[in-house]
A protein has these predicted regions:
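Compositionally biased, intrinsically disordered or flexible polar/acidic segments
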Residues: 2-233
């Protein structure tokens, strides 16, 4: 019996079997969430994406981001207010939208105004990268709203690592506001804002918006990777 246990334990320790076990555990977690979670796969046309490089000068817009191949534009025409900050030390990050940011020293609430399609399901992604752009060594903490409703609290806890917030949302009108709300002494910032229209069958939900709960990358046993996204109402 002990020999069998030792053999089973040794098999689990192999990299391939550990990957299989990880995938099985992940599958069980997803099943356990039942109707409150789904795997999200965006099969939209990239031409329908909204990709804003926040703080990008209009003269440098648009551009094709080398790592993703997506076309980014300046956020200049989508928000009133805010100032442009440039990250001097990006911590080795190669993602181009992290090189600049927009920060909001004035006002309590600063909102992006975006044109969307009413009733369409969107994956909304907001990226925040501090990089000590102001030299003050003060990590920002503030709230993020969808219109008048609370989305999440953005608590940036690392200087040189991006903070990413994601949510699935169905706008009820053709206009969508994404607002940064100052809640303390630190200054709200944002590096990038991305919207992806999703297929209606990507996630079936009747309880409003769905905030990202977890993300996991698992091997597909062929050489690539599969991204699993778990969203919670």
């Amino acid at each position: 019996m002990n020999d069998r246990r030792n053999l089973f334990s040794s098999c689990l320790k192999t990299p391939q079997n550990m990957e299989i076990l990880q995938g099985l555990v992940l599958a069980l977690i997803i099943v356990a969430f039942g109707t409150t979670t789904r795997l999200v796969q965006a099969a939209s046309d990239p031409r329908e994406f909204i990709n804003l490089d926040c703080g990008l000068h209009p003269a440098a817009s648009p551009y094709t981001e080398p790592l993703t191949g997506l076309v980014f534009t300046s956020d200049e025409n989508f928000i009133q207010g805010g100032q442009i900050g440039r990250v001097i030390n990006d911590g080795g990050e190669a993602y181009k939208p992290l090189k600049v940011l927009r920060y909001f020293p004035d006002g309590i609430r600063n909102c992006y105004h975006l044109k969307v399609t009413s009733g369409t399901k969107y994956l909304i992604k907001a990226v925040f990268f501090y990089g000590n752009y102001d030299g003050l060594d003060v990590l920002p903490k503030f709230d993020l709203h969808l219109g008048p409703n609370m989305w999440t609290t953005v608590d940036i806890d690392m200087y040189f690592s991006p903070k990413i917030e994601e949510i699935i949302h169905i706008p009820k009108s053709s206009s969508l506001q994404i607002c940064l709300v100052k809640t303390g002494k630190s200054t709200p910032i944002i590096s990038a804002l991305e919207l992806r229209p999703l297929r209606d069958d990507t996630y079936v939900n009747t309880n409003g918006s769905l905030k990202l709960l977890a993300r996991n990358y698992a091997s597909d046993f062929i050489g690539g990777s599969i991204r699993y996204f778990i969203y919670l109402a």
